[in-house]
């Protein structure tokens, strides 16, 4: 068991709520205050188990034997998923009053960028719960069962999804164009067209993402937010954001949000999850 530290405060309850609402059955489980999931990387596979240790200020992590040879990679990915490197004091200084209600809120990332890209595409125009159910069906159909852990499957690899029949994906309950977009996404991951690590120029990376079929502006930005854990993403034309800024155009909202650079991703999450928030009069 290893302790991966965080800088307090850390709002574990909020993070669990966010991730649990999007949990993919068969891949991940929340239980007894902790989290378990299947994971595969560099030919190794196994289970990750973790739980918060509030007294020690960190996550207690246990890896199954299959993941021990890639333990450092696993720890780094866990750090990305749970945003353990975040300095909440810096966020508070940048966001000011916006961060006061939830000073320990973090930016949920991803263990695997390709997985997050698939989730982002499957989340288009459906509820969070429906997206999670649909993703679980894809995982069950194209993910490899984890033999040593009955009931768990590995999230499908790009290789597996690149060979999928679009009609079989459509039969799970998605439009044919979305099924075809998933297959293209998998092939783009294999060819390098889909950047799986954050590029030096995030804006250029976002433009590249939007050249892929089925990836529009919202999906590209949401993927960057979580798959790349980009810290300065804002969505001025997001439905909920527009509700929080009544009477303002997306251009005006974008101008307002400049005050939170270079941490607009954190501002976005705070605004999404603060029902009574309203912009200051200017």
Language model features: what each stretch is:
Residues 1-282:
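HhH-family (HhH-GPD) DNA N-glycosylase catalytic core used in base-excision repair
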